[in-house]
Amino acid sequence: MLTQIINGKILTPQGWLKDGSVLISDNKILEVTNCDLAVVGATLIDAKGMYIVPGGVEIHVHGGGGRDFMEGTEEAFRAAVAAHMQHGTTSIFPTLSSSTIPMIREAAATTEKLMAEKDSPVLGLHLEGHYFNMKMAGGQLPENIKNPDPEEYIPLLEETHCIKRWDAAPELPGAMQFGKYVTSKGVLASVGHTQAEYEDIQTAYEAGYTHATHFYNAMPGFHKRREYKYEGTVESIYLIDDMTVEVVADGIHVPPTILRLVYKIKGVERTCLITDALACAASDSQTAFDPRVIIEDGVCKLADRSALAGSITTMDRLIRTMVQKAEIPLEDAVRMASETPARIMGVYDRKGSLQRGKDADIQILDKDLNVRAVWAMGKLVEGTNKLF
């Protein structure tokens, strides 16, 4: 089956292509060309002058559509994934916050089942914790937080192959051994919920930690002790040129001015956008899965208002925030939501850009950057056909 999308501004790795077309054959991109002549036998989609861009690659998300990945069930996973696909996400790494090993095993079993399905948007499991600094726990469950334990993580990574990312605080005892081990298994090691200083971050990077979890959140910046000033985790990460970062670009977790600063220092190639969304995202629900969490001012907070606890945002809102509030070019905002996370997670060979031979993960955005249509693996996502 052939589908041809014409009459739109197409974002390619080389820049914008005007008046061209994207030809889809089953689940792959057959061609991206500057010719928009109709192909015989193809179903024609008129983009009506809108933006044709890659689908979003979400690497840090806890739930959506009223369901949380911590539930561990197939029903919850499918509902949350479907909710985010309505907003332009076409690839997703479900995230668990600090959990018990039985909870991780249940979620891993569900993840593996979904990954095995043909054309699945689920690409792997992300573990946010539970090896964190208790002082920087934020919305994490404190009773689950502990130091890295090889008697836990080695058997877990031996028995399952769906875990693609695992976050930890590098200053903890055993964190360097943990980083070296998980990266030896092809798992992305990320620093998060940490008070690490420059020496910690430098050593962590050398041990395999190449990424930073929700940059600026749950980590200190520049600070004073008595009369002296010290760099924080934030500045330390800036100083490691090749370290990648992710930002919750809802304009609340990180203000637009700081989003622009991250963009200017780390650049498109080392900055990706994440929702860090909870169950209430992409839904009418005003109740979080975690009873400790309230929704107020358009964000999730701990009930005592001591910390933010996640977002209610979606991928399309991240792009709008970066463009409309942080004043970043649309092409760069889209790349940070697609190409960069795909590179970070090692799936850029098939995801993250509109190129011949890649998976047909495509979204169409109107002039206000609202989602008007989404294709995941060449199939139109139900409920997104707002062009027709």
Where are these regions (language model features)?
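Active-site gating loops and adjacent loop-to-helix segments of metal-dependent hydrolytic enzymes
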Residues: 82-93, 134-160, 203-244, 284-308, ...
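His/Asp/Glu-enriched, well-ordered alpha-helical/loop segment
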Residues: 229-247, 263-275, 280-365
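Alpha-helical scaffold segments that flank or form the walls of functional sites
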Residues: 50-52, 59, 69-121, 144-159, ...
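Divalent metal-dependent hydrolysis catalytic cores, especially in the metallo-beta-lactamase
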Residues: 62, 78-107, 120-133, 160-171, ...
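Conserved, mostly hydrophobic/aromatic
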Residues: 127, 182, 212, 322, ...
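C-terminal cap of metal-dependent C-N hydrolases
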Residues: 8, 288, 343, 353-388
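Active-site core of metal-dependent hydrolases
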Residues: 158-283
